[in-house]
């Protein structure tokens, strides 16, 4: 699918990618689906679907933000894993967290690369990326998050994470390849079902997303740049930069919010978002 920015001049392309970066930054780490909003917002603004490559490449800004925000945590994880390999200290919390991150990345890595190299064209044009599909998925995920909020024990903390926790949350992360699911939403929901405290669940979700989103962004970066040869890399850099700044703010806000509040705000938002999309599609999209 051709990138609509190919028909935009440099200023228009920079403005479009700036907006996409802001949308990406606001929605990547909140459990409301960045993919859905990056599909819907450009459609509403008349830009058309920017495509998988552009949206994946702009996610690199979010990854830069999460790496910078959690630089101390990541440094501790790397040191813990290093000690585990040298001295066999795999019971240390940092080593177990690193192992859980690796195990949790495998599902989305395998499935994501499979889609990229075996079903790329079909995925771009799949009904799964349609507005009604995104709306229905958003509503279903809202109901699952509501159930997790109700039944979750909210006792598990990040320092007791095990490989099985990483695999469970990692499988949920792989579901986010379906537009509308929300990587943050699916991982947060799975972690709540597994008995995690809200803020620790969000923290692990952010850390777990680093490898998978980084790989996806780098894989798609070449295609994203090739999609708009006339404007060069500047628009994409603007999008990545705005995504980084807004992502940092969103991470900081969400962690503080979940220390004091439940996820019901996001449940309500996703229900309303999904219902409004169905109404909009029924009025305008089905004709």
UniProtKB/Swiss-Prot annotation:
Domain of life: Bacteria
Record membrane topology: Multi-pass membrane protein
Catalysed reaction, written as an equation: di-trans,octa-cis-undecaprenyl diphosphate + H2O = di-trans,octa-cis-undecaprenyl phosphate + phosphate + H(+)
Single GO cellular component term: plasma membrane
UniProt keyword annotations, A-Z: Antibiotic resistance, Cell inner membrane, Cell membrane, Cell shape, Cell wall biogenesis/degradation, Hydrolase, Membrane, Peptidoglycan synthesis, Transmembrane, Transmembrane helix
Coiled coil: none
One GO molecular-function entry: undecaprenyl-diphosphatase activity
Primary location recorded for the protein, binned into one broad class: membrane
Enzyme Commission number: 3.6.1.27
Chain ranges passing through the membrane: 50-70, 97-117, 131-151, 160-180, 206-226, 234-254, 264-284
InterPro entries xref list: UppP
Pfam families reported in the protein's UniProt record: BacA
Function in brief: Catalyzes the dephosphorylation of undecaprenyl diphosphate (UPP). Confers resistance to bacitracin.
Homology family: Belongs to the UppP family.
Additional notes on this entry: Bacitracin is thought to be involved in the inhibition of peptidoglycan synthesis by sequestering undecaprenyl diphosphate, thereby reducing the pool of lipid carrier available.
PANTHER family attached to this UniProt entry: UNDECAPRENYL-DIPHOSPHATASE (PTHR30622:SF4)
Protein name: Undecaprenyl-diphosphatase
Lineage, uppermost ranks: Bacteria, Bacillati, Cyanobacteriota, Cyanophyceae, Synechococcales
Gene that encodes the chain: uppP
């Amino acid at each position: 699918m051709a990138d609509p920015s190919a028909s935009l001049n440099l200023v228009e392309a920079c403005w479009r990618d700036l907006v996409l970066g802001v949308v990406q930054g606001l929605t990547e780490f909140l459990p409301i689906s960045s993919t859905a909003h990056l599909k819907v917002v450009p459609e509403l603004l008349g830009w058309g679907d920017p495509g998988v490559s552009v949206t994946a490449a702009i996610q690199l800004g979010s990854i830069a933000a999460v790496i910078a925000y959690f630089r101390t945590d990541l440094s501790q994880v790397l040191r813990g894993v290093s000690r585990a390999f040298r001295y066999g200290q795999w019971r240390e919390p940092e080593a177990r967290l690193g192992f859980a991150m690796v195990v949790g990345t495998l599902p989305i890595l395998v499935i994501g690369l499979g889609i990229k190299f075996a079903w790329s064209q079909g995925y771009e044009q799949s009904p799964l990326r349609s507005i009604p599909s995104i709306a229905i998925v958003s509503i279903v995920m809202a109901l699952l998050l509501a159930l997790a909020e109700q039944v979750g024990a909210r006792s598990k903390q990040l320092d007791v994470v095990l490989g099985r926790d990483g695999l469970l949350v990692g499988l949920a992360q792989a579901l986010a390849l379906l537009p509308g699911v929300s990587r943050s939403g699916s991982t947060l929901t799975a972690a709540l079902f597994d008995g995690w405290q809200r803020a620790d669940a969000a923290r692990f979700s952010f850390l777990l997303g680093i490898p998978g989103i980084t790989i996806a962004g780098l894989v798609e970066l070449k295609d994203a740049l090739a999609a708009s040869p006339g404007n060069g890399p500047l628009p994409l850099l603007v999008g990545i930069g705005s995504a980084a700044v807004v992502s940092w703010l969103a991470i900081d806000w969400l962690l503080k919010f979940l220390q004091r509040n439940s996820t019901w705000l996001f449940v309500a938002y996703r229900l309303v978002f999904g219902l409004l999309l169905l109404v909009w599609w029924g009025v305008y999209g089905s004709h």
